[in-house]
Amino acid sequence: MFSGPSGHAHTISYGGGIGLGTGGGGGSGGSGSGSQGGGGGIGIGGGGVAGLQDCDGYDFTKCENAARWRGLFTPSLKKVLEQVHPRVTAKEDALLYVEKLCLRLLAMLCAKPLPHSVQDVEEKVNKSFPAPIDQWALNEAKEVINSKKRKSVLPTEKVHTLLQKDVLQYKIDSSVSAFLVAVLEYISADILKMAGDYVIKIAHCEITKEDIEVVMNADRVLMDMLNQSEAHILPSPLSLPAQRASATYEETVKELIHDEKQYQRDLHMIIRVFREELVKIVSDPRELEPIFSNIMDIYEVTVTLLGSLEDVIEMSQEQSAPCVGSCFEELAEAEEFDVYKKYAYDVTSQASRDALNNLLSKPGASSLTTAGHGFRDAVKYYLPKLLLVPICHAFVYFDYIKHLKDLSSSQDDIESFEQVQGLLHPLHCDLEKVMASLSKERQVPVSGRVRRQLAIERTRELQMKVEHWEDKDVGQNCNEFIREDSLSKLGSGKRIWSERKVFLFDGLMVLCKANTKKQTPSAGATAYDYRLKEKYFMRRVDINDRPDSDDLKNSFELAPRMQPPIVLTAKNAQHKHDWMADLLMVITKSMLDRHLDSILQDIERKHPLRMPSPEIYKFAVPDSGDNIVLEERESAGVPMIKGATLCKLIERLTYHIYADPTFVRTFLTTYRYFCSPQQLLQLLVERFNIPDPSLVYQDTGTAGAGGMGGVGGDKEHKNSHREDWKRYRKEYVQPVQFRVLNVLRHWVDHHFYDFEKDPMLLEKLLNFLEHVNGKSMRKWVDSVLKIVQRKNEQEKSNKKIVYAYGHDPPPIEHHLSVPNDEITLLTLHPLELARQLTLLEFEMYKNVKPSELVGSPWTKKDKEVKSPNLLKIMKHTTNVTRWIEKSITEAENYEERLAIMQRAIEVMMVMLELNNFNGILSIVAAMGTASVYRLRWTFQGLPERYRKFLEECRELSDDHLKKYQERLRSINPPCVPFFGRYLTNILHLEEGNPDLLANTELINFSKRRKVAEIIGEIQQYQNQPYCLNEESTIRQFFEQLDPFNGLSDKQMSDYLYNESLRIEPRGCKTVPKFPRKWPHIPLKSPGIKPRRQNQTNSSSKLSNSTSSVAAAAAASSTATSIATASAPSLHASSIMDAPTAAAANAGSGTLAGEQSPQHNPHAFSVFAPVIIPERNTSSWSGTPQHTRTDQNNGEVSVPAPHLPKKPGAHVWANNNSTLASASAMDVVFSPALPEHLPPQSLPDSNPFASDTEAPPSPLPKLVVSPRHETGNRSPFHGRMQNSPTHSTASTVTLTGMSTSGGEEFCAGGFYFNSAHQGQPGAVPISPHVNVPMATNMEYRAVPPPLPPRRKERTESCADMAQKRQAPDAPTLPPRDGELSPPPIPPRLNHSTGISYLRQSHGKSKEFVGNSSLLLPNTSSIMIRRNSAIEKRAAATSQPNQAAAGPISTTLVTVSQAVATDEPLPLPISPAASSSTTTSPLTPAMSPMSPNIPSHPVESTSSSYAHQLRMRQQQQQQTHPAIYSQHHQHHATHLPHHPHQHHSNPTQSRSSPKEFFPIATSLEGTPKLPPKPSLSANFYNNPDKGTMFLYPSTNEE
């Protein structure tokens, strides 16, 4: 409806490329806001219609008048928008804004003199509207009033009434109103058309008021028409846009394409606008060759390059990066770029300038003025500068080639760019010579992006340099900076010239005068370089060329419409030429852009793209409601198909107008439901074979030949015919064939299983690809063939999985070795069981193909054929659920049943860490079955945290799996989602939506799109593998798992429910007692933490910092403590060996006779590492470290450190490298020793031990030997904390040492090292959370303490604390649990170690923890001990004091029963035996705390330390082989239980119910306290511990 003079719709272009891009546009990409996307200007002042009252006559802005007109046009404007942009909507404020613009125009047309006829309105339009929009608007209005069929959309009758009554106040003919309304409708349609184009370019679908302001600002024609006054220009802050540094290859390629499109438009401007207008005034077109040279050849090269770049981008949408080097290489090898050499020499020659001047001097040149306002001056001044654009763009190519070569990651791409650089080097040199020959004063055009960036920088500079600069001028007028120069201004009436500094922007020209009298500015004032003298808005300025005269040369005139003209003079002719070129470019660019758009649309109308007839090509059937239905306005981009026939789907899949990669993915995922693979390939081959243009245009050829006579007519017909064929091949054949190959590439790349199932399909595809011809197509055929070859090779060579982060899988965990047919939940390690289930289920999940889901084939008869992998995972999940259910119900014995249930929950705990939701919900389903859910007594016997965790897992499946979905969205892969949810959703979609649209035969593709969305979610979790090893025995067990072979579901359910009733009858008051089914299997769980952790030191810092200590230690074999077994109840010796300063033994956790595997630094690494850096010169290594003097394990990479889930959960590390033999290790750390094992089978000596005094060991040691009772294992064995229902006992050997340089402490598998000359220490280990190294980061001075796990103070705990005191000790006062006990003054030479250990291991319980001197239950003992030490020191001689050496070794042996008739001591749990009055360490409890114990202390800290050292030397003399130092407790933080001195080495013990120290054969050996009461139920209290605990990393 809205068309220009030729009947074609006209649009405005945005883009500010070299020369003619509009200032506000963001290029063809249509970028968003601000200076890049439309200037950020606000168009018409302030969002209102300011200025309407400036016109004489009716005031539309008065309240009473505005109320009559408000909302009159908005309903009709919606209809106008539907006509120009059917798929775009507009907000109400945008429509009101357009309405106000229309009212402003109406006020202009109805101003005095008042119009009485149509001719009066025409005159006003000619005067008010700038060219060429005045003629287009008048033609549109005349067509409306002259046509009986066409009527205006705007309400003509209402406007006619208001005009007569209110505006004009006299009667007018209805034709006048109709004419006015038609003009308004044309202008409103033009505005809405431009706004719609703009929002589509920025990927929006709704027009806002701001969008209209942007496009109004970008169009000078409309701004001229509305003639906005300066007073109503509102300031718009110009913010610096995001810097696009093009750091990536992809972004650079996109920028190249953007620049290439703008360059193509500049070439169109040269060819279509200037060249074709000049052809009209010459007799022979060859006269223009000196001016334009071979510009057509350059245009062809540009089109070819741009097409190749776009093809590469489309083909590589799902690849890592597009490789565009081949695009340049093909053109360079064909010497296509050489056209720039000829062009550069021709255009810059004097002959070219002379030819243009001669042309303009011809009489016919006067007709150029009719081409548009200022066109003749544009030809004279602007065209020569525009002709330099192709030369400058050649240098843009050189820059892009160099930049892309540097960014490319493909070796082939880099080689292509290197080849191109070599081929184009001669051209580069030639063009540099040409540019050097140009006059230095002749300015070279720059790109629009550079001009926009310069505008931002210069406006900020002018704010600082120019006095009286106003920010309000910036917003819509300073989007591009054109130039900065000096001109002379002629004074008014006098021949006085004044120098002006001129700044030219796309919408503003500022003339400034230099500040010659610079004064020292006052405080806070700014010193300006210039003063603002004049400013002109370029849309209201005309430029008039002034011929040279004797008085005035090189001058031109600026003629503002509202101000008197001024004359400016340039330095010389070339200077004037450049200024005129820039000024005319700014003024005429909007008019030239509109003219170019009209020409391009006219070309399309003259040479329409014709489609083949449906008879010869079935994919050319026109769209209709019978073959395709589109979605309702889903987006402003590519239309979405709701339903279509199969041929229409194939047509849109390979559409010639646009590419839709989302539709390609959706179609290839879901097509199998309505089309077979064979049928799809056949349709794609038919789609590729497009009819020849001779068959399409044969009717036009005969008609044209008969309708034209003469040679000229035949030549014109041939040219037109050639253009038709050319457009057909370029715009239809090539895009369709290219997109067919793209679909084939996607098919073989992402759905190759179709070809694996059907070899004939693959053979047919290869046969088709062999016969594809054409150089451009062969390149893409080769890419498809490469993918096919790669897929075939992958099938033949089972590629090894490369795990994320480069980690190795953790080693296999074993619990009990039993035959395969005796595997149960109790025999498998819960950690490894969960790992293997997760690994198996992920592989099953990964193998499910989209073809197994589309159309719900798993519910059909042939499901075994169509959905084999899906049925496999469904069957496996059901079997696991049945197996858990059967294992629980068949366990008659209550303790076994409870252990099995606990073991199943532990498996779920690990699965939650591994994100195996499918496995978790399968076990939850087993717990929720009728036969298990009713076992009330069994569930009540579970520990509290187990019950709580089970409830949390059950909540995952509540409320339609709401919490599960939230959790799934929050985790990072790898994971195993619950497949049942996907199947349910797909089934609901399949059954709830018809396959065909209602009352049609069209495929319901919206249904397929929804299914594809679900399948896409499934696929996104299939690509990240687990870093786990496969254990063949467990894998085979679960692959063959069939708990009820051959039974029906009803038979299984009945059997399980009957078993459940038998083991727990209805209403039973107590649990029935049954004998144990597996009496030989220990019921205690090994926990869910790995029980072996090798120790290695891969830090390079350790080798130098500990060389002296290691060398001294390696020179001797070391002292060990051997707790001999003198009673039948003791079967093991605790053997400790420490060869180096960096090694300390911990339990291996292996079964008897089993060798631990080679160390793996990432043994427990499953997920991404977490960094724990150095703190205060102490670095924590990833694993407990050791240095071997006999061999190197070959590990050189820095291992990923680990953190424990709970404080006190001691992880034992495999340390066979430091033991005398593997058998010794097996004995010391076996989880349970059989009762029949004779003592002789155990080693009772250490080959490294000697009778002589051993050199000091640099590290304290802790060796744990579990008791022989079956099922009672020490918590030190590296598993989850023991349940209070299981007692534990162990033999503990502590070997301590003190050095002047630093201390290292080991307890329960944790190694705490204060830095010894930079030596890195160790950190606790977690099996599932990796902690990578970052030793160069600085943190607080000391590591933070672990989170406290303080127990509630109860009466029994208080009594136990009192029992620990000496018999004559005073009664302990009650203490508040939150108060910190007063510290003992520190030993200066051990302050570093004490400070370190206090904060790094504040919760290490009985064996590792706070200094015993910091605890109230030991402080009084230490006071009395001090006096005893003083007396002994005075009575003991010191003959060997000097020979003792600076290093001493403390050995503390806590042995189990020595005599056969003595009862065993109470078991001690390190996690449950801490003092009941211990409060968490706070920063105030530093070693230098001034708090002093309330009991008197006679000696100062320094004298006290001296006495301790004296006593140490005496002990060394008394016991040269094995000696003890009690004062080492507060120096190295040994266990804080009190010790008493006894001279009688054979003192007997009392009943274990009361606490008496354990005696040894050595005087002064510390005594082991009793196990405290477990009534606090620490582990089962959810407030005290969580399911997976992690150490705190924050300061308490």
Curated annotation (Swiss-Prot):
CDD domains: HFD_SOS1_rpt1 (cd22914), HFD_SOS1_rpt2 (cd22915), PH_SOS (cd01261), RasGEF (cd00155), REM (cd06224), RhoGEF (cd00160). Residues 829-1066 form the Ras-GEF domain. Pfam families: PH, RasGEF, RasGEF_N, RhoGEF. SUPFAM superfamilies: DBL homology domain (DH-domain), Histone-fold, PH domain-like, Ras GEF. The keyword Cell wall biogenesis/degradation does not apply. Residues 480-588 form the PH domain. One of its GO terms (molecular function) is guanyl-nucleotide exchange factor activity. Residues 1526-1542 have a biased composition (Basic residues). Residues 1175-1195, 1280-1291 have a biased composition (Polar residues). Residues 1096-1105, 1469-1489 have a biased composition (Low complexity). Gene3D superfamilies: 6.10.250.3060, Dbl homology (DH) domain (1.20.900.10), Histone, subunit A (1.10.20.10), Pleckstrin-homology domain (PH domain)/Phosphotyrosine-binding domain (PTB) (2.30.29.30), Ras guanine-nucleotide exchange factors catalytic domain (1.10.840.10), Son of sevenless (SoS) protein Chain: S domain 1 (1.20.870.10). Residues 637-792 form the N-terminal Ras-GEF domain. InterPro entries: DBL_dom_sf, DH_dom, Histone-fold, PH-like_dom_sf, PH_domain, Ras-like_GEF, Ras-like_Gua-exchang_fac_N, Ras_G-nucl-exch_fac_CS. The modification Phosphoserine is found at residues 1550-1551. Residues 1352-1366 have a biased composition (Basic and acidic residues). GO terms for cellular component: cytosol; extrinsic component of cytoplasmic side of plasma membrane; plasma membrane; rhabdomere microvillus membrane. PROSITE patterns: DH_2, PH_DOMAIN, RASGEF, RASGEF_CAT, RASGEF_NTER. It comes from the Eukaryota. Keywords: Developmental protein, Differentiation, Guanine-nucleotide releasing factor, Neurogenesis, Phosphoprotein. Residues 248-434 form the DH domain. One of its GO terms (biological process) is defense response to virus. Residues 1073-1105, 1175-1212, 1235-1291, 1340-1392, 1465-1596 are annotated as: Disordered. Promotes the exchange of Ras-bound GDP by GTP. Functions in signaling pathways initiated by the sevenless and epidermal growth factor receptor tyrosine kinases; implies a role for the ras pathway in neuronal development. May form a complex with sevenless and DRK. This is Protein son of sevenless. It comes from Drosophila melanogaster (Fruit fly).
